[in-house]
């Protein structure tokens, strides 16, 4: 999913940010193409999810995996609502930067 997602955080008075690039893993190309129509809703939901996270939690591997699972569930929810099926198996973080 391009462009990469960027979220800003304020931690202990310091500005921090997260940048994450995502790939959707699915088996049916036609379903993935159909899901692209709903990309604005998917991106909005993911931005809201990412910006609502605790920065300190994201700095741990467990926190990153939990976020990946929540992001996967968010996209699957939109797919189920709009297309009547889950469509994607997983979202994969292909790049994850915290600063």
Give, region by region, the residue ranges found by the protein language model.
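Flexible, low-complexity charged segments
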Residues: 1-99
